[in-house]
């Protein structure tokens, strides 16, 4: 997450993020082989109308982890994600290269890929306790790398969102004049269903078939955002 500070009406600097989001069918091999990887577990203590407060744990240096299959009969209400969280915390204590970071973020709704986002580190134990008590969690592996001149992040979701891959292009200013890469199937920047706070409550496994039918009917779509 890259924050850019903009000056508000009262002269104070306000943090914003600029990103565009795309549905991806398959994780590019370059991302798996050359991207930096982290595993993310997060929950939303508030999410309504596009506004959200998020608590996140980011695990780095864990290596490639193959998550077990999600079983809806027993893994509902965050049981799967909390189980994986416990395993990640245990593994992070024994892996020499592992590190864990806890953060809390406040977000506004996104308009054309621009939104307010303020993120700070928080106490690890407090973050763990919040996540362990949360029913709606998001679990994903994130691969970050440069594609041409842009930084990209590929989120490969697990648990109740298993099968979903989303790519995000972030800049320090509005993402305009973007050369759409081949891996981008269609743009979902303006589709609220693909926000993580929405995926925590209405996961991919509840509407993936509907989305694929919509995509087949209308075809790919990309925002035409150009510099002035």
Predicted regions located by residue number:
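Phosphate-end processing signature that detects enzymes handling 5′-triphosphorylated RNA
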Residues: 2-228
């Amino acid at each position: 997450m890259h924050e850019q500070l903009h000056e508000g009406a009262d002269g104070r600097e306000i943090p914003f993020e600029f990103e565009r989001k795309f549905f991806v069918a398959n994780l590019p091999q370059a991302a798996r082989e050359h991207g930096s990887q982290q595993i993310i577990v997060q929950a939303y203590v508030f999410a309504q109308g596009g506004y959200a407060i998020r608590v996140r744990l980011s695990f780095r240096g864990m290596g490639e982890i193959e998550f077990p299959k999600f079983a809806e009969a027993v893994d509902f209400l965050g049981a799967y994600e909390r189980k994986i969280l416990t395993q990640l915390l245990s593994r992070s204590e024994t892996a020499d290269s592992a590190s864990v970071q806890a953060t809390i973020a406040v977000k506004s709704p996104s308009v054309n890929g621009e939104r307010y986002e303020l993120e700070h580190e928080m106490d690890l134990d407090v973050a763990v306790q919040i996540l362990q008590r949360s029913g709606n969690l998001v679990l994903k592996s994130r691969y970050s790398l440069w594609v041409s001149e842009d930084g990209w992040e590929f989120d490969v979701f697990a648990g109740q969102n298993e099968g979903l891959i989303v790519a995000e292009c972030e800049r320090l200013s509005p993402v305009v004049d973007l050369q759409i890469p081949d891996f981008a199937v269609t743009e979902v920047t303006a589709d609220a269903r693909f926000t993580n706070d929405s995926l925590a409550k209405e996961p991919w496994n509840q509407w993936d078939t509907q989305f694929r039918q919509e995509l087949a009917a209308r075809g790919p779509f990309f925002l035409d955002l150009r510099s002035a």
